[in-house]
Design a protein with these regions (language model features):
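Basic, nucleic-acid-interacting segments
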Residues: 1-314, 325-327, 331, 353-357, ...
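M16/insulysin-pitrilysin zinc metalloprotease superfamily fold
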Residues: 354, 361, 369-384, 392-397, ...
């Protein structure tokens, strides 16, 4: 509860992460997105009589990796259970999941948010209940064809491995829910657990929302509502905001508290911008869980866990700290690099390792490299210039062999001619070193032509000399702006002018 609302919003998220495996959880069917409907199916994922599932060990490895990164306790013994319910896109009539012995227990994820009282930025730890493996359902598609309702089922997705990560109800606003989902997606993508493509359904979320009111010294809670069909950060934020307002109005009208009205499952209508009633929410007993007789339990040894632990060491949180503390990046600069993915951060680190200064490397990464990637819809892996070559160019600028403007021209040459060396790129620009005496003569000419700059500098405006760089470049495009300012300053301070 804060000063803006008479209630406290309580939110828990269930994030469904589609694991990045080549085949499904219990069969060899491909998980590739975009295939023709119902072409990536077999007797196992269709649930045909006599078919038997075989566990995909890669899914276990990725689930353990995620659990370690989320600070969970990894279960040495876990098993499979059947979750029984009927839905058109669930061909077997049950979902193979994990009920009482999930592969990952507890854990937490830290997010950036604001203190509700002071408004200051803080780091908040959100506790997790569990993370368990299960198979995905198929996909129902509803269209209007020739004026009639047309519903079709695509079972290509049925059997794809999912990791469902359940948080405690510790999120307090729509903004926090969005921040949590953003950080979760980033972490899962960084570790190669999912591709994180929300448009393709690789990461989806359900939100459990209710409100807490203070009445006569007691907390009164509204019935919990689960919101389905949240497939974007904006959808999560909008749905939680809408549902909070809806529950507030409903509570004002009815006064019904938790336990006095059934839990609901509501779907999010992104076009209408509202939640819509789907059904009363089921309890675990309604699913009639029982152990799957076709699958043996999973027993994890320390050797299997060790493999996943080694792959979970480089997290976004660890990289944020390294970029800020080791390379002196500003927090917003570090965040921008991290949001681009692990490959971009590694490219930056390689630049510094090859000898580029962190400050200049940051500037060129944020401006030139990322601009190229965005304009060409490219990944850092396809960027035409290696980190070693770009570092060599940046070091040439540091050594005053060329200035930043000419350096960007050289960069353009190297992009246009992949494989062109830094030396050849600089040579192709016709850059020649300007003799010191020639440069001093040029600076004397500049000061003679611009006496107002001398007056401004003597009056304490140290940046006045920057205005001489443009005229200097017109006289000789190869001059170094830094040297121009240094020589002009020396000439003024020595009394020459």
């Amino acid at each position: 509860m804060n000063s803006k609302t008479p209630y406290k919003t309580v939110i828990g998220l269930e994030v469904h992460v589609q694991l990045q495996t080549e085949t499904k959880l219990f069969c060899r069917c491909s998980t590739q997105f975009g295939a023709a409907p119902n072409t990536q199916v077999c007797p196992v994922c269709l649930g045909l009589p006599g078919s038997l599932p075989v566990l995909n060990s890669k899914a276990i490895e990725l689930a353990v990796r995620a659990g370690i990164a989320l600070n969970c306790v990894i279960a040495p013994f876990t098993k499979w259970d059947r979750k029984n319910y009927f839905y058109p896109d669930l061909p077997k009539g049950y979902q193979t999941s994990q009920f009482d012995l999930p592969i990952c227990g507890g854990g937490f994820l830290e997010i950036d948010t604001q203190d509700p009282l002071s408004g200051q930025p803080i780091r908040k730890r959100i506790a997790l209940v569990r993370a368990h493996l299960e198979e995905d359902a198929g996909k129902s598609m509803h269209d209007e064809v020739a004026g009639r309702a047309d519903s079709r089922i695509d079972l290509n997705r049925a059997g794809t491995p999912l990791l469902e990560i359940v948080s405690e109800p510790e999120l307090s606003s729509a903004e926090e829910a969005k921040s949590y989902l953003t950080e979760m997606r980033l972490l899962m993508m960084f570790l190669g657990i999912t591709d994180g493509n929300m448009q393709e359904g690789s990461l989806r979320a359900d939100a459990n929302v209710n409100l807490h009111f203070e009445r006569d010294g007691k907390t009164v809670a509204t019935p919990i509502v689960e919101i389905k069909n949240l497939n974007s950060f904006r959808a999560v934020e909008r749905a939680v905001l809408y549902e909070s307002n809806r529950q507030f109005v409903l509570f004002q009208e009815t006064g019904l508290a938790i336990g006095q009205s059934p839990k609901q499952t509501r779907g999010w209508n992104d076009v209408a911008g509202e939640t819509e009633m789907q059904r009363e929410k089921e309890d675990s007993a309604d699913y009639r869980y029982f152990p799957c007789p076709d699958l043996v339990p999973v027993v994890l040894g320390e050797s299997e866990i060790k493999i996943s632990r080694a792959a979970a060491t480089t997290t976004p949180a660890a990289l944020r700290k390294s970029l800020v503390e080791t390379h002196a990046l500003k927090p917003n600069e570090a965040e921008t690099l991290i949001q681009q993915g692990r490959g971009v951060v590694e490219y930056f680190e390689n630049l510094v390792q090859e000898g580029a200064s962190p400050k200049r490397a940051t500037s060129w990464m944020l401006q030139d490299v990322l601009r190229y990637l965005n304009e060409n819809n490219a990944s850092i892996e396809t960027y035409p210039i290696s980190a070693a070559s770009l570092a060599k160019l940046l070091m040439a600028i540091e050594a005053s062999k060329l200035d930043t403007t000419r350096g960007k021209e050289a960069l353009g040459k190297m992009i246009g001619q992949p494989g062109l060396s830094v030396e050849k790129a600089i040579e192709s620009l016709g850059i020649a070193q300007v003799d010191t005496s020639e440069l001093e003569s040029l600076c004397m000419q500049l000061l003679t032509e611009n006496p107002d700059v001398i007056d401004k500098f003597r009056a304490g405006n140290n940046k006045a000399l920057i205005s001489l760089v443009g005229p200097a470049k017109k006289k000789n495009k190869n001059v170094d702006p830094r040297q121009v300012q240094e020589i002009c300053q020396r000439l003024i301070e020595s009394g020459t002018f």
